[in-house]
Amino acid sequence: MKKAHIISHTHWDREWYLPYEKHHMLYIEMMDTLIDTMEKDQEYKCFHLDGQTIMLEDYLQVRPENRARLQKLIEDGRIAIGPWYVLQDEFLTSSESNVRNLQMGYKLAQEFGGKWTKIGYFPDSFGNMGQAPQLLKKAGIDTAVFGRGV
């Protein structure tokens, strides 16, 4: 018998079919609900925050008073963050941009206790850069998840 894992997560486009401000407020509501739910329900083990750490800044821009609550869930391994700063279309950006994106994601993860997801997360790229394995290996990441464009 094969084992399947269901991972609770969001895929978060900061702006897509709605203006940034509308998406931002929907995100704030989602995070408020997530934090409340995780604090009340210890059986809710983990939530994957879409591989991007900028979401932490976006949330705390509106709810700075919740930093300690959010950080505790991250430190406890219940909210998985990173490794990226933003979830880019890595095929359309330069190699240098992808390196800097990973460095910025790592730096922000350090500010939240240093736990970051060691998964090269590419759920929504329209192709993958040839340097992805090299970049991930240099970052100590040996697993990748990718979606469309392959």
Task: Give the predicted meaning of each segment.
Residues M1-V150:
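Carbohydrate-active enzymes and regulators
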